[in-house]
Amino acid sequence: MNYRDYLQQLIYKIINPLIHGMIKIGITPNFITTTGFILNVVAAGMFVYAGICGGQNDLSILGWAGGVILFAGLFDMMDGRVARLGNMSSKFGALYDSVLDRYSELMTFFGICYYLSVKDYFIYAIIAFVALIGSLMVSYVRARAEGLGIECKVGFMQRPERVVLTSLGALFCGVFKDITAFDPMLILMVPLTIVAVFANITAFARVRHCYKVMTANEKKND
């Protein structure tokens, strides 16, 4: 069992009572998915608001936005769990979840890029945009590969890691907004830079994985 599976099982043990309660009162996976998406839209709006109207409290707003993203990530875990335990899994539900996940990331990174641009952190905004590109490509390569019949889950920087790094970066940027030893914006940018680098590495690693699998399959068919 790798670290991701271990943490997932640990979190499931904690939230399972809540999951069973949701199933009992009739909450559907799609409702949970939609709620998580709305929370990410709220977080994106908070980044935009911090850029326009935040003033001296803008970093505090960033911190709250990070907390909202982290909370929304919990819904991202619960929808699939409710679907499985409640026997409500469906192909449309899987599609709906995947589509709203992509919209959620787009909205979140749009908010971050907007904030950084408005605050004249131009280089930081580019890094955030590169992180967005990598995040989308990780998901796209997997979806395209699975459409070709290839399982493609390799790589480190998957969605849970991206959500945790982005949300905690924003959260702690707000918590330590009054630090004077360095620009507190670095607290957000270090994890975003990690996402930017490793998400794109993961995307290319998945392309390489698909190439190896396809090449091996072609040799078998010869």
From Swiss-Prot:
An annotated Gene Ontology molecular function: phosphotransferase activity, for other substituted phosphate groups
Catalytic activity: a CDP-1,2-diacyl-sn-glycerol + 1D-myo-inositol 3-phosphate = a 1,2-diacyl-sn-glycero-3-phospho-(1D-myo-inositol-3-phosphate) + CMP + H(+); 1,2-di-(9Z-octadecenoyl)-sn-glycero-3-cytidine-5'-diphosphate + 1D-myo-inositol 3-phosphate = 1,2-di-(9Z-octadecenoyl)-sn-glycero-3-phospho-(1D-myo-inositol-3-phosphate) + CMP + H(+)
Cofactor annotation comment: Contains a di-nuclear catalytic Mg(2+) center.
Keyword set includes Lipid biosynthesis: yes
EC number(s) given by UniProt: 2.7.8.-
Protein residues bound to Mg(2+) 1: 76, 79, 97
Membrane topology category: Multi-pass membrane protein
Cofactor(s) the protein requires to work: Mg(2+)
Alphabetical keyword list: Lipid biosynthesis, Lipid metabolism, Magnesium, Membrane, Metal-binding, Phospholipid biosynthesis, Phospholipid metabolism, Transferase, Transmembrane, Transmembrane helix
Keyword Membrane belongs to the record: yes
GO aspect biological process, one term: phospholipid biosynthetic process
Entry superkingdom: Bacteria
Location(s), subcellular: Membrane
Residue numbers binding a CDP-1,2-diacyl-sn-glycerol: 80, 84, 90
Membrane spanning residue stretches: 32-52, 58-78, 99-117, 121-141, 163-183, 185-205
Binding site for Mg(2+) 2: 76, 97, 101
Xref: Pfam families: CDP-OH_P_transf (PF01066)
A cellular-component GO term for this protein: membrane
Pathway: Phospholipid metabolism; phosphatidylinositol phosphate biosynthesis
Consequence of gene disruption: Inositol phosphoceramide (IPC) and phosphatidylinositol (PI) is absent and ceramide levels are increased. Results in a mild growth defect. Does not appear to affect production of outer membrane vesicles (OMVs) or OMV cargo selection.
Main localization of the protein described in the UniProt heading: membrane
InterPro entries xref list: CDP-OH_P_trans (IPR000462), CDP-OH_PTrfase_TM_dom (IPR043130), CDP_ALCOHOL_P_TRANSF_CS (IPR048254)
Role of this protein: Catalyzes the conjugation of the 1'-hydroxyl group of D-myo-inositol-3-phosphate (also named L-myo-inositol-1-phosphate) with a lipid tail of cytidine diphosphate diacylglycerol (CDP-DAG), forming phosphatidylinositol phosphate (PIP) and CMP. PIP is a precursor of phosphatidylinositol (PI).
Family indicated by similarity: Belongs to the CDP-alcohol phosphatidyltransferase class-I family.
Protein name, per record: Phosphatidylinositol phosphate synthase
